[in-house]
A protein has these predicted regions:
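Beta-hairpin "wing" of winged helix-turn-helix
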Residues: 55-64, 71-72
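Amphipathic alpha-helical dimerization/coiled-coil segments
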Residues: 78-117
Length: 117
């Protein structure tokens, strides 16, 4: 997979996409409902940003029944994965990333039917 630095940084320049990427970098895989709950944004807005990241091969999606789960594409070049990891490490205790992590951990019934229905 090929991604250039300009494309990756352009995708990360959007605050919503950056928050999603940090959550996914930290958690490994999340259901759309978990991201929607954590960021407190509408499902269509979340889906639009996820589609953009998926279409640019930064994310991979998989379906389990009616749920769609996203993860960072393991085929990203090492430098791109390192950028995401260093960004997470340097900002995990900074807002809004700290609050996002707390909101996700406080989410009841992750990722059960109650959140994904």
């Amino acid at each position: 997979m090929q991604i250039d630095s300009e494309s990756l940084f352009r995708m990360c320049a959007d605050p919503t996409r950056l928050r999603m990427l940090m959550l996914l970098q930290q958690e490994g895989e999340l259901c759309v409902c978990e991201i929607t709950h954590t960021l407190a944004l509408s499902q269509p807005k979340i889906s639009r940003h996820l589609a953009h990241l998926r279409d640019n091969e930064v994310l991979q999606a998989s379906r389990n029944g009616q749920w769609v789960y996203y993860r960072i594409n393991p085929s990203l070049p090492d430098w791109a994965r390192a950028v995401l990891q260093h960004t997470l490490e340097g900002n995990a205790h900074v807002e809004p990333f700290r609050s996002d992590h707390r909101a996700l951990k406080a989410m009841p019934d992750r990722p059960g039917a109650a959140c994904c229905a």
